[in-house]
Amino acid sequence: MTEEGKKDSEIVLEFLKDKKIDAFYCSPYKRSMDTIAEAAAFFTKEIITDERLREREKGSDGNNHGMFQKRWADHDYHEEGGESIAMVQNRNIEALNEILSDNTDKEIVIGTHGTALSTILNFYDNSFGCEDFLRIIDWMPYIIELDFEGDKLVGKQEHCHVEKEFKGKQRADKK
């Protein structure tokens, strides 16, 4: 893990350590697991990985501001070999609903990626779009609390983020 990754993991632990956490779920990608690993160890919990929480398959055209705008304007658009926003959203909501069903009245942590999280936020608030996505990919780690009653979102609060000079800003500057 890089020094920056270690600092990110410490930030997550510092935020969570006074909470009661029942379970940790995560994308199987190493960087997401590393970000929540220190907190999971603190709570003596295993990290349950779920392939559906992974990042979007980017395909042949890569990631640039124009492609971000195109994908968010048409959630069904995807380049060859890549996933659309709708595809990512479907698998993430399926995973989230299963996690919520298995953890009724429990406090859980989900470690995932910018696009994956953005599709979840868009599912519950369709005004969440490309500019919101670009904002949060510059804020990793980004801690947001979502409160559910069953599978219904009843509350949302941003708690913590680390603002970084990341690709979203660079891409936005290259409009």
What are these regions (language model features)?
Residues 17-20, 99-107:
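Glycine-rich phosphate-binding loop signature in dinucleotide/nucleotide-binding domains
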Residues 1-47, 83-86, 140:
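Active-site-proximal alpha-helix that buttresses catalytic centers in soluble enzyme cores
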Residues 156-175:
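Acidic, His/Gly-rich catalytic cores of divalent-metal-dependent hydrolytic chemistry
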Residues 26-27, 90, 111-112:
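Short beta-strand scaffold positions
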Residues 41-94:
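Phosphate-handling substructures
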Residues 106-115:
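Generic beta-sheet signal
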Residues 32-33, 116-118:
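Short, active-site-adjacent cap segments at secondary-structure transitions
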Residues 125-155:
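Domain-level recognition of soluble alpha/beta enzyme cores
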